[in-house]
Amino acid sequence: MSTGVFAGSDAPFPKDWQTWPVTHSGAIPGSASVISPDLPTIVKETFKTYNWVADGKGSAYNVRLSAQAKGPAAARNGKFADGDSAVLELTDAKVLLVTSHLLGEPQYGVYGYDGKDLSGAHPSLAGKVCNTCHSGYSEACVAGVCSK
């Protein structure tokens, strides 16, 4: 018999996420789309990582920032308070990619709109994938919160 460990999301589900203002909207193209080579690397990697959602059709998205994250995100200083920080809302897929902070360090989670943890539903939803991109693109991401 084989057993595995399901770690789940590190960031908690942000119960009031729908009240956070949308700071940016766009779309992740479907898997059949050609990605422009002129886009920033983090955008291309995000598209490649999540173009499978909604049966390969991609998804519209909204970026939402909590009230406590707006100042540090705008200042790009990395001084996020503990708690909920940001959500990338995949509207067509009804999925939330969540960033929160604990002791100044980013925590990541993936949830359905209903709060169900989806971090084990696909390899690209694992926390280590979030951490790799969010820490690997310092031109776009500061302390785990990325901007366009």
Task: Give short role names for the model-derived ranges.
Residues 4-61:
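General detector of N-terminal leader/presequence modules that precede the first folded domain
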Residues 6-30, 72-148:
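Sequence context surrounding c-type heme c attachment/ligation sites in exported
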Residues 54, 65, 115-117:
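Generic alpha-helical secondary structure signal
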Residues 57-72:
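Short, structured beta-strand/loop micro-motifs enriched in basic residues and often containing a Trp
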